[in-house]
Amino acid sequence: MDDVTKALNLVPMVVEQTSRGERAYDIYSRLLKERLIFLVGPIDDYMANLIVAQLLFLEAENPEKDINIYINSPGGVVTAGMAIYDTMQYIKPAVSTICVGQAASMGALLLASGASGKRYALPNSRVMIHQPLGGFQGQATDVDIHAREILALRARLNEILAKHTGQSLETIAHDTERDNFKSAVDAQAYGLVDQVFGQRQEELIQSS
């Protein structure tokens, strides 16, 4: 691992004064105490397990208080994203989603699936929706099986987007035929987020 890679992988530490003296946290653990979760980078099984564990932990800690997920992701594995989605819908606390940077593919679906009225995007963030990608190779019968699975996944993802955006299934199917990029304002108009803001809102501070 070169010096640049090591530097990029460094996680800042913060020091907090407690009744027992100083305690050091990595920045993400400290923010988790404030019920802030970061979904950053490609969505794979490892990331999904981390996000699901954090959601379940915060629910156990306080089932009545909102959880905030900050999303900056190009998307990733559909089944991993669905594990996060199902957990967001399953737990009792309302889950607010905030797009910083980009929310593409499964990242966009998770952004849209936040609690109604609590889905946000920063003004220069980008959102992209599209159909699931396939690239299976092998025997013709196996290719056919995987093709039918992709079509089933596509139908289910379209249903979820339609549910959370208020768009019709026909509109979602048409708009996800190809990569469909949207600005934060366009994402709000489409129903992917509820609000675009450049400064932290007072109600978001209080819900945290």
UniProtKB/Swiss-Prot annotation:
Record flagged with keyword Nucleus: no
Q: Which residues form a coiled coil?
A: none
Listed GO biological process terms: protein quality control for misfolded or incompletely synthesized proteins
Principal localisation: cytoplasm
What PROSITE patterns does the entry give?
A: CLP_PROTEASE_HIS (PS00382), CLP_PROTEASE_SER (PS00381)
**So what EC number does this one have?**
3.4.21.92
| Entry protein name | ATP-dependent Clp protease proteolytic subunit
Its organism's taxonomic lineage begins at: Bacteria, Pseudomonadati, Pseudomonadota, Gammaproteobacteria, Lysobacterales
